[in-house]
């Protein structure tokens, strides 16, 4: 009787080899697939980073996609002006030119969601006229006292172009548009040999309980903080400072048992607004131990140290970048640096460095 393998044994061996090879392929694929979780408090710039990834790595937005942003941009613009006009009432700030009252009524008559391909010309004219009023400008300067979209001034300054009949949103218009993120959105893109699956989760408090679904096998956390909000209060709770909320959230994420082995990249975002605010809104009013006055570098160092010092793990490194999420050139450079960090972390985890 021969000692050769039976047909059944050969088939079993072949199946085992195929399973082992598939497991190896899966492991290689996992190493090349980066699961990145975008975290941060509401309005910190997470969705803007995702839009930048589309611009930088996916060839940008098609004409149809740009068209789809029109209603969002129109609604953002009208709603922002309405917020200012309502704030003028509560802050008891009058219009300088009472003839503007007609335009104010036009703005208040608009629905919350503007529909259509063109902003009605009377609405564009009303916003353009009212934005020039000194009373409106004075109220805008006090925007930290109420909840105003960061992009308000940008859209008001560009209202003539936005209200034109042939208007087509450009990259900046799209990047600055704001829709509250609810639930979890996933974006996939490729950088070099790595495939990124980037998850954006709602930043408002009511959305945070949904983050748990994203936690498994996360390679990296990209945590965003709007440092320009050091003097603002939460949308959901106007007794809580936004920067304090971000510090509390970062503490809970950085030191969570879920993320002991997860690399964390911290984007200290909205540096353009931060630099503008420092001379007119002293940081010491909100953080009494800060001693740097309106010096931009000193203020950046202070905030950086406040976040990094929360890390309780000696072996865990927090990678930090100061960013302006609407600046495509800068985000392209920063994300290239992030990619290098992730490659190094992958090699280290695989024992290759």
Swiss-Prot record:
Matches recorded under Pfam families: G-alpha
UniProt cofactor(s): Mg(2+)
Key words, A-Z: GTP-binding, Hydrolase, Lipoprotein, Magnesium, Metal-binding, Myristate, Nucleotide-binding, Palmitate, Transducer
Lipidation (N-myristoyl glycine): 2
InterPro entries, sorted: Fungi_Gprotein_alpha, Gprotein_alpha_su, GproteinA_insert, P-loop_NTPase
Entry GO CC: cytoplasm; heterotrimeric G-protein complex
Source organism, top-level taxon: Eukaryota
GO molecular function: G protein-coupled receptor binding; G-protein beta/gamma-subunit complex binding; GTP binding; GTPase activity; metal ion binding
Residues the entry annotates as binding Mg(2+): 47, 181
Region (G5 motif): 323-328
Binding site for GTP: 43-48, 150, 175, 181, 203, 269-270, 272, 325
Chain residues carrying a lipid of type S-palmitoyl cysteine: 3
Positions of region (G2 motif): 173-181
Region annotated G1 motif, chain positions: 35-48
Residues covered by region (G3 motif): 196-205
Biased amino acid composition, Basic and acidic residues: 7-25
Keyword Lipoprotein tagged: yes
Oligomer and partners: G proteins are composed of 3 units; alpha, beta and gamma. The alpha chain contains the guanine nucleotide binding site.
Role according to the record: Guanine nucleotide-binding proteins (G proteins) are involved as modulators or transducers in various transmembrane signaling systems.
Similarity annotation: Belongs to the G-alpha family. G(q) subfamily.
Protein name: Guanine nucleotide-binding protein subunit alpha
Gene: CTG1
């Amino acid at each position: 009787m021969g000692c050769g393998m039976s047909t059944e044994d050969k088939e079993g061996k072949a199946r085992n080899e195929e399973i082992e090879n598939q497991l190896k392929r899966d492991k290689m694929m996992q190493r090349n697939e980066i699961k990145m979780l975008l975290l941060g408090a509401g309005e910190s710039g997470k969705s803007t980073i995702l839009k930048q990834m589309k611009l930088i790595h996916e060839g940008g937005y098609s004409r149809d996609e740009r068209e789809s942003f029109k209603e969002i941009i129109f609604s953002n613009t009208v709603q922002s002006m309405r917020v200012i006009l309502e704030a003028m009432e509560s802050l008891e700030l009058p219009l300088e030119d009472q003839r503007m009252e007609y335009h104010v009524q036009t703005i208040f008559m608009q629905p919350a969601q503007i529909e259509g391909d063109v902003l009605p010309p009377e609405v564009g004219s009303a916003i353009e006229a009212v934005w020039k009023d000194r009373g409106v400008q004075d109220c805008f300067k006090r925007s930290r006292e109420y909840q105003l979209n960061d992009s308000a001034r940008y859209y008001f300054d560009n209202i003539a172009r936005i209200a034109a009949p042939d208007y087509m949103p450009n990259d900046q218009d799209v990047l600055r548009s704001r829709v509250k993120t609810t639930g979890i959105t996933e974006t996939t893109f490729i950088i070099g040999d790595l495939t990124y699956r980037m998850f954006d989760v709602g930043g408002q408090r009511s959305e945070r309980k949904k983050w748990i679904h994203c936690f498994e096998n996360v390679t990296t956390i990209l945590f965003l903080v709007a440092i320009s909000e050091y003097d603002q209060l939460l949308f959901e709770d106007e007794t809580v400072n936004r920067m304090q909320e971000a510090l509390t959230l970062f503490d809970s994420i950085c030191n969570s048992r879920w993320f002991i082995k997860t690399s964390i990249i911290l984007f200290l975002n909205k540096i353009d607004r931060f630099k503008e605010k420092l001379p007119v809104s002293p940081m010491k009013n909100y953080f009494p131990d800060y001693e740097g006055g309106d010096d931009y570098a000193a203020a950046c160092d202070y905030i950086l140290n406040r976040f990094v010092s929360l890390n309780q793990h000696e072996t865990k490194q927090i990678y930090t970048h100061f960013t302006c999420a609407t600046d495509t050139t800068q985000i392209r450079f920063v994300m290239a640096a992030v990619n290098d960090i992730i490659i190094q972390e992958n090699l280290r985890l695989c024992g290759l460095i």
